[in-house]
Amino acid sequence: MKLIVAAVGTRMPDWVETAWDDYAKRLPADCALELREIKPEPRTSGKTPAQMMAAEARRIEAALPAGALRIALDERGRDLTTVGLSQQLEKWRGEGRDVAFLVGGPDGLDAQLKASCGGLIRLSSLTLPHPMVRVLLSEQLYRAWAILTNHPYHRA
């Protein structure tokens, strides 16, 4: 199984890339974590937010492997505990599908793209900056794997 994070935005600060790389390399090959950065639509194009999100949605869809289960990160998504995420990860592993986590741009994700997803989750009730979302998501996916494998990283 591959865990793919398709995130709108490029040119993250070095600390984001360092943290992402650290968690990604900790995961084993059978639960690989991969980042696919999606070019954001220019905010100076004169397009409406809906048009910009639709353009970004097309780029996201083009970056996803066929058959991957899509999970959108959204402020209105379902709250998951860390243990709940590990249980969900175990279920996805059992299905044998790649899982793609979709992270929108400044305006969020296109409504049609969200509707095509197998689920919506949120990392927090707080508003998080996009660089933090990448770090938190990668850490939580690693922690979920650690719970499943009884790795000492997670001590609850």
UniProtKB/Swiss-Prot annotation:
Q: Which domain of life is it from?
A: Bacteria
Q: What is its EC number?
A: 2.1.1.177
Which InterPro entries does the record cross-reference, listed alphabetically?
Alpha/beta_knot_MTases (IPR029028), RlmH-like (IPR003742), tRNA_m1G_MTases_N (IPR029026)
Cellular component, GO, one term: cytoplasm
Provide the binding site for S-adenosyl-L-methionine: 73, 104, 123-128
Broadest EC class assigned to this enzyme: transferase
Q: Could you say which protein family the record assigns here?
A: Belongs to the RNA methyltransferase RlmH family.
Function according to Swiss-Prot or TrEMBL: Specifically methylates the pseudouridine at position 1915 (m3Psi1915) in 23S rRNA.
Q: What is this protein called?
A: Ribosomal RNA large subunit methyltransferase H
- Organism the protein comes from: Bordetella avium (strain 197N)
